[in-house]
């Protein structure tokens, strides 16, 4: 169905090949995992599959890509769009309207599909994806998981034969990830060819027919069983409930911030927290629980409707919407922006530690999702602040870079407090020493992590699956 024959690609104004003589074949009806370290070439492969290269991204392409034995370059872009559905890591980039129903019919309207056929396809997709409760809603006010389903639904209305999902679990809680697994299984059983570019593998391991590992622009094809036993490619865990704590520490009584009976509309109610220097707080809860709202209040982006936030803190928030936090034309100038007095050695050491040194002259918007994430973390680390907050900091991160980020954040906690909103239990166990669980608009649990309280974390995540 999809075949790459000796494909190499170099982006315009770059001398380095992103892909080098790549060969593989994906058969009809297969569910394929595309994985590899951040920046290895996964996104380039995806963009070649769906026609964004060369339609949007210029460069030198050699070799051939075939779809159903026809050269992809001879197929018109709109035909590729109909046959090969694509859902990016951030589905908001797909949307052209603010209403879920309007969005689901938008692509069909553009392809001139008849009204009767549009209604038929719309109803079929709503039933398949169980979208009944989120149709005719404002896209801005539904959860990340619900946006993901709408984006998938938009692709399915065109009746594609191939569906590409780019990091589909990156911002989803355990409950929504479980629903995503069920959805992928449904699509597979209906005969769709599914390609999943992903670092987190635990939730789809039983559905995968083959694995394509991208490493330094080259491809290695293996089975899922081979992947479980490999030693030459560091993996995100396949068993999220069999992990060890790596940051057990006693409570520090050096108070940094007091949140006193704070509410925000009907999103958060009567929140009270004491935050101490040295705390690395894992802020957990389902999508829509209010985690992002709490972080924004602590950064003064939003003001509480009731209660007080007391303390002399300098906050810094790394948001999910990474592109909104870039202002300059290179990685190096981005780090220097607002940090002009920081020594060069300190900047270079941090770039080296987070694997960004070779990208220091690159435009931030051209980085991969994982590289953007690490750039913002490096800016936070070098800024003169004492309360650092991160909203899903591991989205798009492979195992190696997740470990690098964890190490940097633990070092930062020695003189500061950190709050990390995350669904990533592996990262949480590596990095955090305290858990705050938001549920039903308020704090349900607040405890320091040790081997005894670890079982409580398991119970919370299992509860979030239900």
Put a short name on every predicted segment:
Residues 58-70, 307-315:
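Conserved ABC transporter NBD signature motif
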Residues 116-134, 344-359:
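Conserved ABC ATPase "signature" region
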Residues 138-142, 146, 363-367, 371:
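Conserved ABC ATPase signature
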Residues 152, 377:
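Hydrophobic anchor residue at the start of the ABC signature
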Residues 163-166, 388-391:
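Catalytic Walker B motif of ABC-type/P-loop ATPase nucleotide-binding domains
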Residues 173, 398:
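ABC-family nucleotide-binding domains
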Residues 198-199, 422-423:
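H-loop/switch region of ABC-family ATPase nucleotide-binding domains
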